[in-house]
Amino acid sequence: GLKLAVDQRKQAIEAAEVLDEADLSDNDKYERSYLIHVLQGELFWLTEADWPHKNPDYYTGALDPNVYIARPYADAETRMKAFIKYAKNVPAAARQIEANLQLPLPETYLKYGQAGFGGFAEYYGGDAKAAFADVKDEALQAEFDAATAEAAAAMQHLADHIGSVPATKDGYALGAEKFSDMVRLTEAVDVPLAELKAIG
């Protein structure tokens, strides 16, 4: 769950920080620094910004099935089987997301979430279905239809759920302290906000 995601990143940072620089090449030092920076940025969104509970965007990227459609890493039948496996896991993921997101959502987040989750619901039986139309295995096509129907229903339910409570007009702003932390932890820019504002 989310706690595991946080703990894994903290442990990875600790493991990287205890490496003896004397044993590292310049390239290794750079890669270690980059790794720590990326993990600190991910921790910011997970914890301080609390996106798993506040922002549907935290989930839409991971749910995007485009890799099975747009990237010909294997033949269509193999990718179709992978898509089916993905689709069969969508209902459980949708339930977890529903449990995590705290309503009401800010208006901008709600619109994004409904467009994303609702868009997936349409995509499964539309463009995704069309992408594998040339696969002649009827049993596989039937399995695809069943899996994507359940996945689409789960995503549409999620889109409806987050809209079941009227959105707030605010709640999306980080505030000065968190914004400063975001810039420092995700962009490695440790500059006072007043100076950043002056720079433009």
Region roles according to the model:
Residues 1-199:
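N-terminal maturation segment of proteins
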